[in-house]
Amino acid sequence: MTIRHQGQQYRPRMAFLQKIEALVKDMQNPETGVRMQNQRVLVTSVPHAMTGSDVLQWIVQRLWISSLEAQNLGNFIVRYGYIYPLQDPKNLILKPDGSLYRFQTPYFWPTQQWPAEDTDYAIYLAKRNIKKKGILEEYEKENYNFLNQKMNYKWDFVIMQAKEQYRAGKERNKADRYALDCQEKAYWLVHRCPPGMDNVLDYGLDRVTNPNEVKVNQKQTVVAVKKEIMYYQQALMRSTVKSSVSLGGIVKYSEQFSSNDAIMSGCLPSNPWITDDTQFWDLNAKLVEIPTKMRVERWAFNFSELIRDPKGRQSFQYFLKKEFSGENLGFWEACEDLKYGDQSKVKEKAEEIYKLFLAPGARRWINIDGKTMDITVKGLKHPHRYVLDAAQTHIYMLMKKDSYARYLKSPIYKDMLAKAIEPQETTKKSSTLPFMRRHLRSSPSPVILRQLEEEAKAREAANTVDITQPGQHMAPSPHLTVYTGTCMPPSPSSPFSSSCRSPRKPFASPSRFIRRPSTTICPSPIRVALESSSGLEQKGECSGSMAPRGPSVTESSEASLDTSWPRSRPRAPPKARMALSFSRFLRRGCLASPVFARLSPKCPAVSHGRVQPLGDVGQQLPRLKSKRVANFFQIKMDVPTGSGTCLMDSEDAGTGESGDRATEKEVICPWESL
């Protein structure tokens, strides 16, 4: 991409052309448009011609505008080729008289976006050369010779096409042939305009025509040439530097002032426009007693920074008074007041400055050279705002080269720098501005979290469990986690704590993440049984008697589903029991429950599908009797009498003697026949 790159090269992007086209279409309306009729031009009668006065009158009445605005709009329409003149084709303006005009065919409108190629223009020039027998305009001859050299390899094709078009044109009648010639000429006057005419289709950097410049066909006078020579001589006298030196100065300036840039480096103690803290304005007041350290350090950058700051000027004035040259800064301030003060008081202020600083024997007389004094005194005869610029510049350079360097080394500046305060950064409020907003770490993407969750589930499912090993399916795990909603530990005052529960009422489970100590996840009941099997065996060996059996998971589920305590039901045959178990699993486990809760022997389920909080529920709930129902896995194995544990993920746990009998170890799946 270059500096002259326009993008979408040479395509008319002017939106107003569409508005002009809509207006031209209204003009051609046979009922409400411009009045058109056959007009005789030379020896030919041209159809659908109109006069310039009729066009202007229609524009004024249609758009309700003045005659001057209508004339300007009409010139636009003609210059862009929507209307072309019949009598003076080169003069692309709309004359408010009886001059004849005609509408251009839509094929030649600028918005058709087909390029005006050199081949088409060469064919047009060759056809005119044949028709006029070599009599062309000067610029047309130059273009003809240039295109002949440029397209010499296919010039025979150009000549052949020109002859064919000329032969086809002779077969038309005289009126159509004349109208077509005028249309082509008007098109090429717009797209290949003669020298000295403005190309209306140029835009951007291509539009270099200045309407005020001297025309090409006019000769320059001696005065104009002398002015041009003087301009170039002054341009040669200007000092120039290399681009590398200029860029180096810009980089140095940026590095020097970067710490004082409130946008790039921030401001101390805080930005008052963001934090609503006005301490920054209080510390940086114009004549504050103790300025900030950053403000005092900035005075050492250059003399303009010092003299621009009111506090810096006050300190510098104190230094100049000690050196008996305070009148220099006073004169500079008086000149600034004259330059930017009221216009009505310019003469009065100029006289006061002259009497105080410039007159012989003045009270605060300044020391300037005689030449500058003569220029100043001569200008005071007719005072204006800038009459003292010469004297002001002289005093400014004197202070910059002499007094400024000594001020930076003086104890006044060093004491000011030592006493300057350095405010600490205060806590900012949340900001909506991007350059002052504190950058926060973005949270992980939900897609990544979902992938991690799926990977964890896949790893858990990949852990094979051998459920045929004896003595590994008993005893609840001491580390249990039951997920029932959002993650929040129960409060001590929760109505679900052990101290607040009533053993006679069902439990409503809150949506909480209830954890026991040292727990991480909520394992499946089979996995809990596998991990706790070794502890159960040791417990069975060392204890002679066991605690009374607590309710099983399915018994607790039956108790929570029924509104009253269930009564004992007779056992069903094995196959009927299998079908009943599978139907209840689909009805209760899949349809009624929002999630598949993994329950432990001490987590009774309730009818609303949530999980009861962990605790001493098993000891408080009464012994329940339920039907013997099979689940996906029915685990039958030897259970010690009065062990206080029950089978997990099963509804086989019965009551009475059937639950106390030792049975043979077997695994029954729902896809196998009992």
Curated annotation (Swiss-Prot):
Tissue: Highly expressed in the caudate and putamen, lower levels found in the hypothalamus and nucleus accumbens and very low levels in cerebellum. Not expressed in globus pallidus or cingulate cortex. Isoform 2 is expressed predominantly in pineal gland and retina. Isoform 3 is expressed in retina (abundant in photoreceptors).
Xref: PROSITE patterns: DEP (PS50186), RGS (PS50132)
GO biological process, one term: dark adaptation
G protein gamma domain sequence ranges: 219-280
Domain DEP, chain residue ranges per copy: 30-105
SMART domains to which the protein is assigned, alphabetical: DEP, G_gamma, GGL, RGS
GO molecular function: GTPase activator activity; GTPase activity
Modification(s) after translation: Retinal isoform 3 is light-dependent phosphorylated at 'Ser-478'. Phosphorylation is decreased by light exposition.
Coiled coil, from the record: none
SUPFAM superfamilies in the record: Regulator of G-protein signaling, RGS (SSF48097), Transducin (heterotrimeric G protein), gamma chain (SSF48670), Winged helix' DNA-binding domain (SSF46785)
Polar residues bias spans: 553-565
Pfam families according to UniProt: DEP (PF00610), G-gamma (PF00631), RGS (PF00615), RGS_DHEX (PF18148)
Span list, region Disordered: 533-573
Disease annotated for this entry: Prolonged electroretinal response suppression 1: A form of bradyopsia, an ocular disorder characterized by prolonged electroretinal response suppression leading to difficulties adjusting to changes in luminance, normal to subnormal acuity and photophobia. PERRS1 is an autosomal recessive form with onset in childhood.
Domain notes: In photoreceptor cells the DEP domain is essential for targeting RGS9 to the outer rod segments.
Assembly information from the UniProt record: Heterodimer with GNB5. Interacts with RGS7BP, leading to regulate the subcellular location of the heterodimer formed with GNB5. Component of the RGS9-1-Gbeta5 complex composed of RGS9 (RGS9-1), Gbeta5 (GNB5) and RGS9BP. Interacts with PDE6G and GNAT1.
Biological role stated in the UniProt entry: Inhibits signal transduction by increasing the GTPase activity of G protein alpha subunits thereby driving them into their inactive GDP-bound form. Binds to GNAT1. Involved in phototransduction; key element in the recovery phase of visual transduction.
Name the UniProt record assigns to this protein: Regulator of G-protein signaling 9
